[in-house]
């Protein structure tokens, strides 16, 4: 971490002796720069190109050194559009890696990959900055305590609980509700835990980033009247950005989160939407740098790049970073190298199912595909573990019976199997829940359900006490008492 003497808006340190080079070649977002002999910049150094284009417009492009080519040439990847750059333009070597503002000044603000505010709310205090490239915490600094992180979402807390200071993946294809689930988690965690969150928007839609910002202002996660009391910092590198920005924006968000953990000694939430776009940007950069592609066209350094990001997301004795990462699954294929590499780093996986989404069950979390290393009796307790296992067994049996039902119909099943199907359908519907952030679309007020209430509800369904209630009563409700009240209302409407 660096303490800068000035509060100027630039995150690039001023240099007494400028090391100057010149652009020799431009290939889209990749620049080749020639430096004087003996003055080559290091890998990951930030280079700045300043000047004017042919129309007289001001140009200020920051690049990051990726390769030393020999013959005093380096190859760098631009963090913003290279429009207007020409061969022969002067390039300044800053002598250091990209540094971004960190600390309380970042809360309630939106930044780009360079740590520059993009929300038109004026400059940010940049006295405290930190380089985006650093090593992961040493083994001796790590904290090994195991504790559950309650989210207030029934299906998550019961069947695939999150670990405090762990890494969680949200897996799903296009349009099954990853971003909505992330927004709900930010909302619940800010309200229930009062914690600080950092959101890294990596290569997703600009509209979604805008919606998220507006949503946070509405729900009070970002406090417009007193910005310092906000609970979240946002870092965006959206779909329209060059691959260099999309590849590094995750590191910018992580650097801000690390400061809250290491210096402020806080428990932080880091949201990355979408980790697949980080891999995709790395693949684009790899091709532009001329590396031979590996399986399915991905970069040969896929595991290394993923590891360097993921290993920094961890709990230390000072504080913790709990990371929730949306993972787009190309063509719904979980064996694709991008999601498969991500799997190796995760403590819990929340898999979103298109089938459940088509049935209108939201959140569309697949209860049988979602997993967690925390679902063990010694961690969650015997009662929670038993309930979760019985819920899974009931749903698994229902899944096995679906083919028979499709061919022969429900009447051909044994009495016991019919009872299992009825309870499984109730469980399936009770796993749905109205979200605070979706109130606008659904018209139903959002619900936060504590873990004890969740376990009690599923125990009542499994015990058979609620067999007489219609399955529709369990759809989009909070706790089990709301389901029984809804059943009475439905009964009243029939009469």
Curated annotation (Swiss-Prot):
Subcellular location: Plastid, Chloroplast thylakoid membrane
GO biological process: proton motive force-driven mitochondrial ATP synthesis
Catalytic activity: ATP + H2O + 4 H(+)(in) = ADP + phosphate + 5 H(+)(out)
GO cellular component, one term: chloroplast thylakoid membrane
Enzyme Commission code(s) on record: 7.1.2.2
Pfam families tied to this protein: ATP-synt_ab (PF00006), ATP-synt_ab_N (PF02874), ATP-synt_VA_C (PF22919)
GO molecular function ontology, one term from the record: ATP hydrolysis activity
Binding-site residues for ATP, renumbered to this chain: 172-179
Keyword terms: ATP synthesis, ATP-binding, CF(1), Chloroplast, Hydrogen ion transport, Ion transport, Membrane, Nucleotide-binding, Plastid, Thylakoid, Translocase, Transport
InterPro entries in alphabetical order: AAA+_ATPase (IPR003593), ATP-synt_VA_C (IPR055190), ATP_synth_F1_bsu (IPR005722), ATPase_a/bsu_AS (IPR020003), ATPase_alpha/beta_chains (IPR050053), ATPase_F1/V1/A1_a/bsu_N (IPR004100), ATPase_F1/V1/A1_a/bsu_N_sf (IPR036121), ATPase_F1/V1/A1_a/bsu_nucl-bd (IPR000194)
Function as written in the Swiss-Prot or TrEMBL entry: Produces ATP from ADP in the presence of a proton gradient across the membrane. The catalytic sites are hosted primarily by the beta subunits.
Family the UniProt entry places it in: Belongs to the ATPase alpha/beta chains family.
Oligomeric form and interacting partners: F-type ATPases have 2 components, CF(1) - the catalytic core - and CF(0) - the membrane proton channel. CF(1) has five subunits: alpha(3), beta(3), gamma(1), delta(1), epsilon(1). CF(0) has four main subunits: a(1), b(1), b'(1) and c(9-12).
The name this protein goes by in its record: ATP synthase subunit beta, chloroplastic
Protein's organism: Scilla siberica
Gene: atpB
